[in-house]
């Protein structure tokens, strides 16, 4: 809710708190000494996590996990593709170069089924890269497995959006009028509340 201070004078009512959940995928890993908290009991945040200090009591930082379904399991090479495809679902993806992809519903979408019930968009799939590949990306695996980490169900990958303008318009409409958007903000205590109505 970083935008609350900028908009706090616009609203006089307290909105119902909305539960939010975020998943961050870092395909090439983390510098673990700058990522992991130093003491699990007190959750002394690392340099990387320190901007989230005000949420410390609401955080869970997991470590030591492994994704066995990302292993070859007889499919041969394709580790990068399988790592992306299995990250949030634990399902070994179907080895295919065609449209008959199959993985599994991801944890973010299971959560969105519950947390997104009272919001216009149950989930947002965002990316910072434009690397949308096509064809055979990794030893017999379709590129769709590398292009998305969220799956609505076993056969429906959810594309990620990396254009901030498109995301903004999806959330708040295509109105170019600042007055129209400001009118919408007056109904809520923060920009994030506008997407949870």
Which residues are covered by each model-predicted region?
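Ligand-binding pockets and gating/stacking loops
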Residues: 1-197
């Amino acid at each position: 809710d970083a935008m609350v201070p900028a908009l706090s004078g616009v609203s006089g009512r307290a909105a119902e708190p909305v539960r939010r959940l975020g998943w961050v995928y870092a395909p090439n890993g983390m510098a673990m000494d700058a990522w992991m908290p130093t003491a699990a009991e007190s959750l002394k945040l690392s340099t990387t996590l320190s901007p989230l200090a005000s949420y410390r009591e609401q955080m869970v930082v997991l470590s030591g996990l492994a994704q066995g379904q990302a292993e070859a399991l007889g499919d041969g090479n394709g580790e990068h593709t399988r790592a992306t495809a299995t990250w949030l679902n634990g399902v070994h993806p179907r080895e295919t170069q065609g449209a008959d992809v199959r993985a599994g519903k991801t944890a973010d979408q299971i959560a969105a089924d519950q947390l997104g019930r009272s919001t216009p968009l149950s989930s947002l799939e965002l990316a910072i890269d434009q690397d949308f590949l096509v064809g055979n990306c990794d030893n017999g695996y379709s590129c769709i497995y590398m292009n998305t980490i969220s799956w609505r169900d076993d056969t429906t990958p959810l594309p990620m959006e990396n254009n901030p303008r498109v995301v903004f318009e999806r959330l708040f409409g295509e109105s170019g009028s600042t007055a129209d958007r400001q009118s919408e903000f007056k109904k809520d205590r923060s920009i994030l509340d506008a997407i949870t109505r």
